[in-house]
Regions:
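Short, small-residue-biased leader/transition segments that mark boundaries at the very start
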Residues: 1-2
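Catalytic-site neighborhood detector that most strongly recognizes the C-terminal catalytic loop/helix
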Residues: 63, 162-187
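C-terminal catalytic core of Y-nucleophile DNA break-rejoin enzymes
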Residues: 66-83, 98-120
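C-terminal secondary-structure termini that scaffold catalytic or DNA-interacting sites
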Residues: 188-208
Length: 208
């Protein structure tokens, strides 16, 4: 069973990103979309300018997996990272609405594989120990879900943030809430019936 990344580890990965390069600025914006919202990599790849409302601080899109609308507040740090990328690092090409592009000619939109590759590189370059832990884009989705569960955020809020259609879809995140589970261990039931007799068996009573 893979362990989730802690909030401290996620912060360490974010801090380790080299934002002095165009790729670093782009990847940092991608990383914040993952760590703050848990957006699926395919939806990040498909993100377009019409999905970003900088004036009203909103981000919205139709999820490719479910076909449902996903909409959230555009957090200040995410807004700043996106604007930094768009204004200073994104290639200036026409007739392309996709936000995230490759850094080399011919410029083209990133796909989900490229998103996952970029995330893997960022994690690998950080000092975070990823042994026995997920470390792709899905790892951040699992981490944000588990951290919300640990913080006792309602399942309805977790469901909306992750863009799940039903409450049942987040059950496996609740199973990952090891910290809280350890605080409420189940009591050992008192033995009864034949099981009780077996436990009280004495060798001297059964000698022939």
């Amino acid at each position: 069973v893979y362990k989730r990344q802690t909030q401290e580890e996620v912060a360490a990965i974010e801090d380790s990103v080299d934002c002095t390069t165009a790729a670093g600025v782009r990847n940092y914006a991608i990383l914040l979309l993952l760590s703050r919202y848990g957006i699926r990599s395919r939806d990040i790849a498909a993100l377009s300018f019409e999905n970003l409302d900088f004036e009203n601080d909103r981000i919205h899109f139709i999820q490719q997996k479910t076909g449902d609308l996903w909409e959230m507040e555009l957090f200040p740090e995410v807004k700043a990272a996106l604007q930094d990328y768009i204004l200073t690092a994104r290639p200036k090409i026409q007739n392309c609405q996709n936000v995230f592009l490759t850094t080399m000619i011919p410029y083209k939109p990133l796909d989900s594989y490229a998103i996952n590759t970029a995330v893997g590189i960022m994690v690998a370059k950080s000092d975070v120990n990823i042994a026995e832990k997920r470390h792709g884009s899905r790892a951040f989705r699992s981490s944000i879900a588990s951290n919300m569960v640990n913080d006792k955020v309602s399942t309805e809020v977790v469901r909306k943030v992750l863009g799940h259609g039903t409450k049942h879809a987040i059950r496996h995140y609740a199973r990952m809430d090891i910290e809280n589970m350890r605080l409420c261990p189940l009591p050992t039931p008192k033995p009864s019936g034949i099981f009780s007799e077996m436990l009280s068996w004495k060798e001297d009573d059964h000698l022939v």
